[in-house]
């Protein structure tokens, strides 16, 4: 007997029971994005490897350890995208969307990172990202945060997420801070674990979000990034905080929040939750005003965020039991007797012509009346349409309300209008 082939570790199948809740959540997310004037963009899953090395930074965990990279048959190095911002910027430059233009874009789809699979973190995962190009004030940063806060309210999870903010300043300001931080770490190298020692010179800001308790204790005495910010970054951050205060959005300034990708500057933010066990990030982003130029375009201010959908779905299911998925089927069409199958098929098509959004399933599995009613219940149908030989001959149909058991016989020409009343 042949061995079963199974899904790759960390890359999951999502079955109909799963995709129903995904579709409802995604529908809410997309509706809010449309309400803020964002347009969808779709990029390839595979990009040239240098794109991510230049955008994310060669000395990052993503590039060093986590990317799925391979050579194609022409020897070109390609990578399954580990995130969406780099590809979005590449597409914007390539198609002339960015220079001297304002763009508000969103994308959704699978990303790939070779990580240890755990709850809410997988090797193939799904992100929804939003990116804004051509606007540099703190007001658009604030609007992105307001957009995400509207999502949380719509999903019923507002009480279970907290906003953390920081400013990491300009490139020059970070260079000065980096020098001061390295000097401090060198004086306490005995406290650092191997990972922090490796990062100390290659990417010292990443030491700030070490999970090692001893390192966290040490960092209480480390130089503060806020003391090294340039005046423009300070003003930008103060403006953002004031806008959020006026909008009634609570937040915490977390001076150790630096994000794991090298392209960020000024504003960085995360929405975090404690409702999935250990604290986890649900949504994160910030400014990346230098990335467009870094990837070959004209200097363009930019800001955006990305959200992991697996973790969001888990959070909604964990904290909002009232979040329900609509029934798969509204109406189940039952037929029994000689010549009724064709009549049922034709009736179903006529009803769909009048009610195109109706979810109507026709029974094609045979079986007696009782079995077909059981199938209707299994699919969650609210109404059954029943066709027997006598109904077909008389151009009629029995309409049965499966919630209260009441039924009536109608002319087939009237059934669509009746269904609209019953299900409206």
Swiss-Prot record:
Task: State the GO CC annotations.
Answer: cytoplasm
Q: Which GO terms describe its biological process?
A: histidyl-tRNA aminoacylation
Give the matching PROSITE patterns.
Answer: AA_TRNA_LIGASE_II (PS50862)
Top-level taxon:
Bacteria
Instruction: Write out the catalysed reaction.
Output: tRNA(His) + L-histidine + ATP = L-histidyl-tRNA(His) + AMP + diphosphate + H(+)
Compartments it resides in: Cytoplasm
One Pfam family cited in the UniProt record for this chain: HGTP_anticodon
**Gene3D superfamilies, per database record:** Anticodon-binding domain, Bira Bifunctional Protein, Domain 2
Q: Mostly located where?
A: cytoplasm
Provide the alphabetized UniProt keywords: Aminoacyl-tRNA synthetase, ATP-binding, Cytoplasm, Ligase, Nucleotide-binding, Protein biosynthesis
What Gene Ontology molecular function terms does this protein carry? ATP binding; histidine-tRNA ligase activity
EC number, UniProt record: 6.1.1.21
Q: What quaternary arrangement does the UniProt entry report?
A: Homodimer.
Q: Which HAMAP family match?
A: His_tRNA_synth
Q: Which family does it belong to?
A: Belongs to the class-II aminoacyl-tRNA synthetase family.
Q: Mind telling me which PANTHER family this protein's record contains?
A: HISTIDINE--TRNA LIGASE, MITOCHONDRIAL-RELATED (PTHR43707:SF1), HISTIDYL-TRNA SYNTHETASE (PTHR43707)
Q: Can you name this protein? A: Histidine--tRNA ligase
